[in-house]
């Protein structure tokens, strides 16, 4: 994919449905009683993996463009699969589906592509083993993962060692098939807010689950505890998926960095556990306005208007991002690092070691590609520091990672000269229409 610099971006665009919410909509609809209509379902290959696995478990699914119809089978109505369940590149599919399969009375095997097969699954194996499910895995707790389900599972109280929406969701989904109430505690936080994405909790409540959230206060912070009753039943309800803010982040950064840009991103999900990217960009001077804010299916949604200024410096006198906020920024860090090349005195990102075990080693991938584009950058075990730099077009390696491909395609828009991104088609993992949508607003 060859990309050339542009003057600015202009126009209003619709983005695909949120990937995180789409996964959960499909899985919870399958566990519900009745048929669910899901509108604006994500077009990503990852979400297609979730649908395919559910079909292999006997769930009837029909897709009409971006609308998906799911006939729920209830909490224990899944069929023993006739083959291995292929999760493709989707870690979300593996981890959330593990929670459901742990409570079924049959064995199943989860597999994935080469990238996913390198990612450790210990964080879901541990709590599910405590709930009496049994597992066999490849060396290092990797795929293929055999799950020997039990029903009912044993309810547990589980303290997450690190904030993780996927592990939390896995335990909550398993809790639907447990005897009694299962509880999940997030790590202590300085603020009385969820410390990871809460799409699962919001959707469970919307579909009728008996789920409670409490904040346990101590002298030095708050511990969020979520409990779910194994007697809960889910009832089908139509769902509308907001546009994906993680996909929106690429266009927000592009428009902010190109002077005289003016774009509107329609009906973007503005869940407070996902808007850290907007807060960070605004703190550095990006001009972002929220319009038409509303609630849809328990999720906050609004239009985002972004104007290009091209002048960025921190309002808080700190160019360092780290600590608790990282859990709510983890998918946006590659594009945030690109943005750092445009900030006065640059940007330092810490406490992001989790990026080492994503679809690629994202820290190493970002550092290498920034250096190829003439940026000055330092690498740390848990992050990086990028200095304000005049980017130059270069040969970029995507490493088969969709977020790397898209982040450096955006960098190419305000670099000097031609940039070629190898393996750019991997963007389809989360955003198949990325280059098409970008073309709509380039001027």
Name the predicted role of every residue range:
Residues 1-443:
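Structural preference for solvent-exposed beta-strand-turn elements
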């Amino acid at each position: 994919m060859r990309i050339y610099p542009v003057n600015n971006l202009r126009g209003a665009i619709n983005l695909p449905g949120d990937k995180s919410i789409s996964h959960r909509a499909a899985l919870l609809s399958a566990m519900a009683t009745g048929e669910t209509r899901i509108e604006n379902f994500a077009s990503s290959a990852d979400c297609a993996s979730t649908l395919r696995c559910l079909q292999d478990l006997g769930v009837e699914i029909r897709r009409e463009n971006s609308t998906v119809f799911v006939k729920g089978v209830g909490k224990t109505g899944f069929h023993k699969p006739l083959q291995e369940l292929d999760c493709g590149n989707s870690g979300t599919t593996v981890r959330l589906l593990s929670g459901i399969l742990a409570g079924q009375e049959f064995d199943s095997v989860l597999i994935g592509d080469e990238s996913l097969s390198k990612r450790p699954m210990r964080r879901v194996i541990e709590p599910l083993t405590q709930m009496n499910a049994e597992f066999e895995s490849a060396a290092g707790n990797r795929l293929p993962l055999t799950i020997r389900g039990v029903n009912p599972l044993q309810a547990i109280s589980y303290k997450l060692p690190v904030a993780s929406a996927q592990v939390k969701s896995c335990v909550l989904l398993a809790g639907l098939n447990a005897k009694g109430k299962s509880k999940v505690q997030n790590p202590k936080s300085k603020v009385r807010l969820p410390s990871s994405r809460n799409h699962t909790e919001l959707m469970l409540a919307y579909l009728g689950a008996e789920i409670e959230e409490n904040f346990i206060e101590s002298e030095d912070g708050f511990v969020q505890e979520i409990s779910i009753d194994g007697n809960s039943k889910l009832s089908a309800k139509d769902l509308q998926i907001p546009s994906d803010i993680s996909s929106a982040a690429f266009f927000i950064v592009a428009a902010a960095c190109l002077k005289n840009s003016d774009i509107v991103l329609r009906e973007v999900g503005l869940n407070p556990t996902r808007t850290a990217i907007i807060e960070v960009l605004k703190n550095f001077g990006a001009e972002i306005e929220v319009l038409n804010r509303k609630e849809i299916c328990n999720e906050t949604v609004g239009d985002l208007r972004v104007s290009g200024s091209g002048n960025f410096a921190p309002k808080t006198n700190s160019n360092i991002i780290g600590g608790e906020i990282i859990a709510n920024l983890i998918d946006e860090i590659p594009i945030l690092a690109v943005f750092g090349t445009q900030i006065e005195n640059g940007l330092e990102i810490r406490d992001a070691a989790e990026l080492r075990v994503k679809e690629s080693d994202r820290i190493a991938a970002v550092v290498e590609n920034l250096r190829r584009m003439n940026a000055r950058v330092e690498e740390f075990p848990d992050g990086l520091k990028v200095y304000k730099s005049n980017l130059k077009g270069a040969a970029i390696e995507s490493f088969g990672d969709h977020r790397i491909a898209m982040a450096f395609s955006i960098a190419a828009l305000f670099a000097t000269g031609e940039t070629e991104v190898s393996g750019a088609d991997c963007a389809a993992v989360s955003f198949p229409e990325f280059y098409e949508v970008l073309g709509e607003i380039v001027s």
